[in-house]
Amino acid sequence: MQSVLDLNTNAHLPVVVRDSRITIGHTTYEVGAVRITESASIAFSQLIAGWSTSPIRMPLAGLVFQVSKELTSLGHFFPLIHILDSTQRSEFRTRLNTLLQNNNMNITYTTATGVITPPLIMRVLVLGQIISCFWGRPEIIDALQQTVPSIALYADRQHYERAGGVGGGCYLPHEHRIMLESNRLFEGFYTPIPNVSPFLHELGHMLDGTHMRLERLPHCYGRMPLMRPIDVSLWQKAKQREVHCYAAWYHQRPPANGQMPIGHPYVFQNDGEFLAGHWEMFWRNPHTMAQMTPHVFTAFYTYVNQDPRDWLSHDYTGYVDGNRAFYQSGQQPWPSELRYDVTPD
């Protein structure tokens, strides 16, 4: 019996192939297809062939794109696509192809055989997220390219650490390079609502490094490139309010209304982490950010000229829940080491 799966509801499921059978989620199939659009499907046999030649495992949506090259299959990774009309989707495809062909956006993949060009799905996952973030301000992508950034992906932990990678991912400001294990690109996409995003976090750091280069500064200041006067003003106000709130919890005098920072103490350790941590949360829990810290939300919303709530119906709440639990636990927050765009209490 033929089975037809709808990609929209199954995009996040893991895929395993064994003995010419494909297991999607917890169900194994012998024949059938995945429906990509109302008029297009891709056969399980094609997915089996694609899975067998892929160097990395990924959710169903990634495998469908790897085999079909159909832009709409990327909606799970770039939910912005869901609200674009046909003309805008064509523009998204054009911007993506332009970046794929641009040597100023260098993406590498280190494996046991050496440094190679990453599979298309990896490059698309990186560049598509950048396009999505700056759909409303494409000139920021131009500025990013001007500084010739690089994204170094590694086949496994061993290659990552051998190259100098630390933690779950890192950004080297003076080399203008993001370093990341390749499987972490897909890590947060195995749930219906995308969750953790190491790449978005490191992209926040890269924006800081881009600002440093464009302004010819000696080091990063926790700012983003092409910030207009209104962006700077909103960012300073948002940062000051969060630092003031954090200081109240640090001194064990939390506000009477119970207001707490949306960010973990980790993001208050330096200006770069403050930017990167809140940047990732803006894209993953915009509804909660807009409600809990509207000043931070407004600063990002104004800067990128778009609202993620337009295409995200629900937040990933893992970060916020964990951070709230920390402040409510009575643990002592760490001292804040923020230096820029804030004044001491």
Q: How would you describe each model-predicted region?
A:
Residues P254-D345:
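Pan-zinc metallopeptidase signature
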Residues R93, Q101-M179, E187-T191, Q306, ...:
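Auxiliary, metal-adjacent structural segments of Zn-dependent hydrolase domains
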Residues P194-H211, A276:
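Active-site recognition of the HExxH zinc-binding catalytic motif
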